[in-house]
Amino acid sequence: DGLNRLLYKCPHCGTEGNMVGKGIKLTCHNCGAEYELTETGFLKADNAIFTHVPDWYAWQRQQVREELENGTYCLDTDVDIAIQVDYKAIYKVGKGHLVHDENGFHLTGGDGKLDYSQSPTFSHTLYSDYYWYELGDIICIGNKKCLYYCFPEAKGVVAKTRLATEELYKLVTKSGLSV
């Protein structure tokens, strides 16, 4: 269960967020394409486009990079927010909104009290996790003063956001662009 969190985009129809992983099956609920994860870790399917999970993931990375280069990538979702300001606990602080685009991350919430931005060059990767402590998928941004644990309402966006963070960092630092 849960392979759909990593392999979120159907290689047959291109739909995102409609992959469902149950047991050893990974199925697109848009076009019906179905893959089976074998005991040796390979994918098996009629008309299989990918037979290896890393190849599928690399294809998704390339798709995200193309969206970034074309200016069409954007994560825009409501989130539940928890923060870590010390090493004692993580505190739930309510609802907010997270945007990730060519300008980096922008998190708002707390009835206007929270407004945090993070540039694309802040980090070459993103701390993200799936079903984190059985609470949900997370995207974590922040700095040494405060970490923001964002639980997206949109499903299947965590892996894509991580890929986008990594590819955006490469694009911005390679081109020397200032964002």
Predicted segments — roles?
Residues 1-84, 98-100, 108-110, 126-179:
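Non-catalytic C-terminal accessory region of glycerolipid acyltransferases
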Residues 87-93, 97:
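Non-catalytic terminal regions of proteins
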Residues 113-119:
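Surface-exposed loop/turn elements that mediate protein-protein interactions on large endomembrane-trafficking
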Residues 122-124:
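Cytosolic/stromal cytosol-facing helical appendages immediately following the last transmembrane segment
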